[in-house]
Structures are given as C-alpha cells and as structure tokens.
C-alpha cells in the first residue's frame, strides 16, 4: 500500500467533513459538470468514468442526473464509503478498485468522459508519474472523448485565506 492509499483509507470515514454540506455539494458539482459536458455535446447517454471517485462526490451526483457512471479509486475504504453512499442515494454505479495510473488493468472499455476531480492529479509527484497517469486516462477515452480534472489554486487560498473553499 502506498502513502496515497493509506492517506485516503484513513480519511474515508471523515472525507465528507471537508464539505460544508456534502449532499448539497454532490448535486452542485453534478450540475456544474453537466453544463460542461453539454457544452462539449454530451448528454445523459454518455458513459463516464470517475477514475478518482473517493467517497463518490461527483459519481453519485452524476448518476442522480441519469448518467451511466463507473467509478474507481485506489482506496478500498473510500470505495466502500462510496458504495454505501450510492445505495443511500438510490443510484446505480459500477465500482472498481483501480489506480488511475493503470486503468487498463481494471477496464477494457473506453468511456465518453473521464473525470479526476478534487485535486487527484497533484498526487502525481513527478513528471514521470503524471505522464503515466495522463496516458492511462487518455487510454480509456473514446477517440472523441473528453477528460475533466480539477486542481485547487493553493496560492490563492494561502493569499486570501477564505473561511471555506468549495472543492472545485
């Protein structure tokens, strides 16, 4: 188990506390992503892979909007939390344990959209690991697919010191 897995396994039961209102955030982020997907010509028939799903924040919201969602994560505990939350929200999501640096080990199919939200990519600490991750992600996209990631602007957060920062 690597340090990232250990960190997120330990955070799984507390991760929702990072949000002012986790349930509202799932809906809010899904609506933002839905608007973005529609700008690129996708609708609810798109098949989405959330390759760093954590506790399901984006996957659950997108599934609630009617998208076909597959969700994976490196943390077994976060996946367990995501499965439980998906059931509580009455949504169907296919879950799998996967490292987003090796997605082809878990998935043979390609997706219309792949997302890696909530600052997943900065865990790639070298140019080599980032390159491996991006190649893995692009390898799971259909030819006309899109990849969406979110990365926090920590410089702005340190400068402005807001009392709360939405995770997007």
Regions found by a protein language model. Give the residues of each.
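Conserved class I S-adenosyl-L-methionine
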Residues: 1-52, 146-168
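Class I SAM-dependent methyltransferase SAM/SAH-binding core
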Residues: 49, 57-103
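A short glycine-rich, Lys/Arg-flanked "PGG" loop and its adjoining helix->strand segment in the class I
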Residues: 131-143
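A short SAM/SAH-binding and catalytic strip from SAM-dependent methyltransferases
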Residues: 112-128
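A short acidic, Gly/Pro-enriched loop at the edge of an enzyme's catalytic core
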Residues: 105-113
């Amino acid at each position: 188990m690597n340090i990232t897995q250990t960190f997120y396994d330990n955070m799984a039961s507390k991760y929702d506390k990072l949000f002012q209102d986790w349930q509202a955030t799932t809906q809010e982020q899904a609506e933002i992503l839905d608007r973005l997907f529609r700008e690129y010509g996708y609708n609810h028939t798109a098949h989405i892979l959330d390759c760093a799903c954590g506790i399901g924040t984006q996957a659950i919201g997108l599934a609630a909007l009617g998208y076909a969602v597959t969700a994976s994560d490196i943390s077994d505990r976060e996946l367990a939390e995501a499965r439980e939350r998906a059931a509580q929200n009455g949504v169907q999501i296919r879950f799998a344990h996967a490292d987003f640096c090796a997605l082809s080990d878990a998935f043979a199919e390609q997706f219309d959209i792949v997302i890696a939200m909530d600052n997943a990519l900065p865990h790639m600490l070298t140019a080599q690991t980032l390159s491996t991750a991006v190649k893995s992600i692009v390898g799971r996209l259909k030819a006309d697919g899109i990849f969406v990631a979110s990365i926090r602007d920590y410089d702005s957060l340190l400068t402005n010191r807001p009392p709360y920062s939405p995770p997007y």
